């Protein structure tokens, strides 16, 4: 495909954009005409001649809009015999954002913030995003005249290409009606900007074109593959745990749902099976939970998941530790990837006069773990394959 193309352009968008762009450029001897990377921060090194655009995350910024405009310009400039390679990774939805006509950046920011605070999952969030965008939901691909090849690293449970980075180069079978229903289920229309509600209503009435759906002829030259599945982190964790002498049990079902509720259910499920697991054991799982924000504190879904685990960890006995982290190194609006708890956490909290339940109710898990020095801080990892949970028992 590369050899048969008149010219090759590359767009990389997401938290792994720098790594993916560098790796792709190094993997081919074919000259790359134009290269654009879109990420949260400029990497230390880029291929010669590559452009870099910095966007915002978890909410889009003016930089995100400028980046999306540049990506759309590159797609529109490609010829019928050219190849556009699109390298996608988690975070691409916010990092590359081009509001649809009548919708402002502020409208999109408020909408995304409200949906996240109302515990919308990534499928719901990105369904709405796609219907407020000029680039998401296959629209980047139909702007290109030539072939579009998408290679994606997934942060989405199930590796749905239409959800990863809001699927800018693949068919979108969600509708304006779906998006409007999500708003009504997550706070009601009054909780969202008027321009957003009006656009979704107009789309539902057929006054605004839908995103290109499966079978759309405009996508017949668009090819997409997942090259890094969401469960990829489990493989690395399993190898590491075995090398340390643990008997490893991998949970096949993804961990999803409200963080604090899923955490309790997860620990109790492990506890019910603990008698059949040889010790020391390591239970590994992955997925992506959500948080309904009711308090005024600071934290993220992994910190909330971890603190909720602490309350029931005793059911696994002594000498137990558990952690949940975001593989991108960023959990919510904090500088931590997640946190760790063990059999001593609640006693240490009590000794420090910290009421775990109060911190959980206020969504203030960062402050709780900071006081106990139990935050996990990796810094940005330049990738994103969802969240990883580990339970260790000696």
Predicted regions, residues:
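A glycine- and small-aliphatic-rich helix-loop capping segment at beta-alpha/alpha-beta transitions
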Residues: 23-31, 50-52, 76, 99-110, ...
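Gly/Ser/Thr-rich active-site loops/lids in small-molecule metabolic enzymes
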Residues: 103-120, 172-187, 295-322
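A glycine/threonine-rich phosphate-anchoring loop and its flanking beta-alpha core
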Residues: 122-188, 200-201
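Accessory alpha-helical/coil subdomains and C-terminal extensions
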Residues: 144, 149, 171-265, 269-272
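Internal helix-turn-beta structural module
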Residues: 306-394
């Amino acid at each position: 495909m590369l050899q048969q193309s008149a010219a090759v352009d590359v767009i990389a968008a997401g938290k792994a954009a720098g790594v993916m762009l560098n790796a792709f450029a190094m993997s081919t001897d074919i000259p790359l005409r134009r290269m654009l990377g879109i990420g949260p921060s400029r990497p230390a090194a880029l291929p010669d001649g590559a452009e870099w655009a910095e966007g915002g995350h978890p909410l889009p910024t003016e930089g995100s809009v400028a980046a999306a405009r540049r990506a759309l310009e590159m797609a529109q400039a490609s010829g019928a015999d050219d190849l556009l390679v699109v390298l996608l990774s988690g975070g691409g939805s916010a990092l590359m954002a081009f509001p649809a006509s009548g919708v402002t950046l502020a409208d999109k920011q408020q909408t995304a913030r409200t949906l996240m605070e109302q515990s919308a999952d990534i499928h719901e969030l990105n369904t709405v995003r796609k219907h407020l965008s000029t680039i998401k939901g296959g629209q980047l691909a139909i702007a290109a005249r030539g072939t579009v090849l998408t290679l994606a690293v997934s942060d989405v449970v199930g590796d749905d290409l239409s959800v990863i980075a809001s699927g800018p180069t693949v068919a979108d079978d969600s509708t304006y009606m779906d998006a409007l229903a999500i708003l009504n289920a997550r706070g009601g229309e009054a909780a969202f900007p008027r321009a957003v509600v009006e656009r979704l209503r107009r789309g539902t009435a057929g006054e605004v074109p839908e995103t290109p759906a499966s079978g759309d002829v405009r996508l017949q030259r668009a090819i997409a593959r997942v090259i890094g599945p969401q469960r990829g982190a489990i493989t690395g964790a399993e190898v590491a745990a075995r090398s340390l002498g643990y008997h490893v049990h991998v949970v096949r079902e993804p961990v999803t749902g409200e963080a604090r509720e899923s955490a309790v259910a997860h620990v109790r499920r492990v506890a019910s099976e603990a008698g059949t697991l040889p010790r020391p054991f390591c239970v590994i799982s992955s997925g992506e939970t959500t948080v309904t924000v009711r308090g005024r504190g600071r934290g993220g879904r992994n910190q909330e998941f971890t603190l909720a685990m602490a309350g029931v960890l005793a059911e696994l006995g002594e000498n137990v530790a558990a952690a949940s982290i975001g593989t991108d190194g960023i959990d919510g609006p904090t500088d931590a990837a997640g946190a760790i708890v063990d059999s001593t956490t609640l006693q240490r909290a009590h000794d420090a006069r910290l009421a775990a339940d109060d911190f959980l109710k206020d969504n203030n898990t960062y402050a709780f773990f900071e006081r106990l020095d139990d935050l996990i801080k990796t810094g940005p990892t330049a990738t994103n394959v969802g969240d990883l949970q580990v339970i260790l028992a000696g």
